[in-house]
Amino acid sequence: MKSSHIALLCIVVLSLFALHECCEQGGQRHSQKVNEACVPGPCHPLVPHCWCCEHLRGIRPQCCWSGSTGRDYCNQQCNL
């Protein structure tokens, strides 16, 4: 490989790493504190990984959500 190819490859790898870090954080910086109203917990024996409203935990078990967007949806609903 020529040195220009190596330099170009390094730039691409660094760009992909930066993009991965940005997507993993949801576009938010570490310094910003996110107000989360939900906590992880089991909502049913068949669905072990759910997000439940912390202030309604044990009172209303139906206030839990699962799935890939469960955390975001839970935070939206619990902050109402």
Curated annotation (Swiss-Prot):
The lineage of its organism: Eukaryota, Viridiplantae, Streptophyta, Embryophyta, Tracheophyta. Keywords: Disulfide bond, Signal. It comes from the Eukaryota. Residues 1-22 form the signal peptide. This is EMBRYO SURROUNDING FACTOR 1-like protein 1. Expressed in leaves. It comes from Arabidopsis thaliana. Disulfide bonds join C38-C52, C43-C78, C50-C74, C53-C64. Belongs to the MEG family.
